[in-house]
């Protein structure tokens, strides 16, 4: 999550043998029990069932499909010689200034490449409800929320640290290791700020229902 002062905060973590939407839904239930009443936006990769899980637990929340993961999915269906051009054109969609411009850019993208790569249309159709949620938020923070990069940076660091340790004797050992890794993030040490300019706070506050007076 992001605190009012703009720093990242780990709201929860859990150990599971596999990654599923049901696991994440359990974590959503956990943060609700600990007092979280509203969430404005969830961003996730292409894991099946995530949008439905979000809507069951936080019906008012928006769900954003990560555009980086979406681009990687597209790349898998593109021939190497075309990949640079195709992915370059795809950037015009999520870098558009307005949602309607993004929609037009995607239509043009599919018109240009759809016949050559017929599976592209299905990729976007499956996540169409989560493509442009980030446009509902101030422009100053959109680059921070149209991907899952914030949590991916943490995950990458955790993966790197865990490789140094050859094995964990039990689940408690792994749990302690993960917890110790997240402590600096929770304390705000060495964490990049994503704080929007003050003028955008009023816009963000109005997104809550009922609107909040203080952040």
Language model feature labels by segment:
Residues 16-20, 42, 66, 78, ...:
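A generic short alpha-helical patch detector that favors 3-5-residue windows
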Residues 38, 62, 142-146:
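A generic hydrophobic-helix recognition signal that picks specific residues
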Residues 1-43, 48, 52, 57-60, ...:
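RNase H-like nuclease fold core
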Residues 41-48, 53-91:
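Conserved beta-strand -> loop -> alpha-helix junction used to position metal-binding or nucleic-acid-contacting
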Residues 92-215:
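Acidic/histidine-rich catalytic cores and adjacent linkers
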Residues 8, 42-45, 54, 69, ...:
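Mobile genetic element proteins and their domesticated derivatives, centered on retroelements
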């Amino acid at each position: 999550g992001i605190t009012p002062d703009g720093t990242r905060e780990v709201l929860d973590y859990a150990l599971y043998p596999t990654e599923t939407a049901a696991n994440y839904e359990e974590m959503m239930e956990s943060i609700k029990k600990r007092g979280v009443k509203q969430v404005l936006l969830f961003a996730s990769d292409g894991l099946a069932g995530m949008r439905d899980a979000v809507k069951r637990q936080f019906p008012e929340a928006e769900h954003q499909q990560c555009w980086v993961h979406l681009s990687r999915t597209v790349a898998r269906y593109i021939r190497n010689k075309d990949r640079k051009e195709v992915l370059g054109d795809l950037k015009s969609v999520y870098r558009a200034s307005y949602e309607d411009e993004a929609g037009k850019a995607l239509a043009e993208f599919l018109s240009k490449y759809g016949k050559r790569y017929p599976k592209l249309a299905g990729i976007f159709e499956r996540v169409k409800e989560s493509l442009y949620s980030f446009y509902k938020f101030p422009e100053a923070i959109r680059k921070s929320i149209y991907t899952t990069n914030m949590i991916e940076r943490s995950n990458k660091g955790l993966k790197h640290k865990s490789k140094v340790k050859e094995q964990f004797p039990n689940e408690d050992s792994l749990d302690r290791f993960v917890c110790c890794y997240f402590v600096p993030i929770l304390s705000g040490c060495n964490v990049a700020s994503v704080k929007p300019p003050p003028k955008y706070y009023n816009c963000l506050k109005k997104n809550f229902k009922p609107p909040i007076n203080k952040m």
